[in-house]
Design a protein with these regions (language model features):
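Acidic, serine/threonine/proline-rich low-complexity intrinsically disordered regions
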Residues: 88-89, 140, 153-166
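TPR/Sel1-like alpha-solenoid repeat signature
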Residues: 65, 139-145
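Short coil/turn linking the two alpha-helices of tandem helical-hairpin repeats
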Residues: 76-77, 83, 126, 148-157
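Short, flexible, mixed-charge acidic loops at enzyme active sites
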Residues: 81-90
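Amphipathic alpha-helical protein-interaction segments enriched in hydrophobic
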Residues: 131-141
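Conserved, well-structured interaction surfaces
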Residues: 3-79, 95-109, 113-130
Length: 172
């Protein structure tokens, strides 16, 4: 075959094809989540400059808040304390870039604020679509996050559990 080293027809026995510089210390979650958070923050910063109907702006703003909340939740779920980023970062933002991580409770409270905004403002646009985000998807995501965080708080933090369980939409 063309590249026998790439299939199981020829086993590589030496380390010549191994480059230690290419091995990641993590699976890339940290970078990927903050990349999506950055995109959401850029959208939120510049969407008012775009000429489009108010309903569409509201929808895309809600979508950005939903994504930002979800990505912060993914970081908290995997790493615990993390940085809350709610603006487009520059090199001048040293306190965020090199500062201490924020407590998971603080971050999750802000995640809940983002999710509440998304649920309140997403509307029924695309409600009949099976491929587009709508208020029902936002509620389902909010439910999943609140139930996870409530359960985590009950068994690990011994606080805040009731708050998240009460905020979870009960019909999802």
């Amino acid at each position: 075959f063309y590249f026998p080293n790439l299939n199981d027809n020829q086993a590589v026995t030496g380390l010549s094809g191994w480059n230690f510089k290419n091995v990641s210390a993590s699976d890339g979650t940290w970078n990927a989540c903050y990349t999506e958070i950055r995109r959401a923050n850029i959208l939120l910063k510049h969407i008012d400059d775009v000429d489009m109907p108010a309903a569409s702006k509201n929808y895309y703003k809600s979508l950005a808040y939903l994504y930002r909340g979800w990505q912060h939740f993914c970081l908290v779920r995997k790493f615990g304390d993390c940085y809350w980023v709610d603006k487009e970062l520059t090199t001048e933002d040293a306190t965020i870039l090199y500062g201490k991580r924020q407590n998971r409770n603080e971050v999750m409270d802000k995640v809940l604020e983002d999710l509440n905004y998304a649920v309140a403002n997403m509307g029924e646009k695309n409600a009949s679509s099976r491929t587009a985000y709508n208020v029902h998807v936002a509620n389902a995501i909010k439910s999943r996050i609140c139930l996870f965080e409530g359960t985590y708080a009950k068994y690990h933090l011994k606080d805040n559990a009731q708050k998240y369980w009460e905020k979870a939409p009960s019909h999802y």
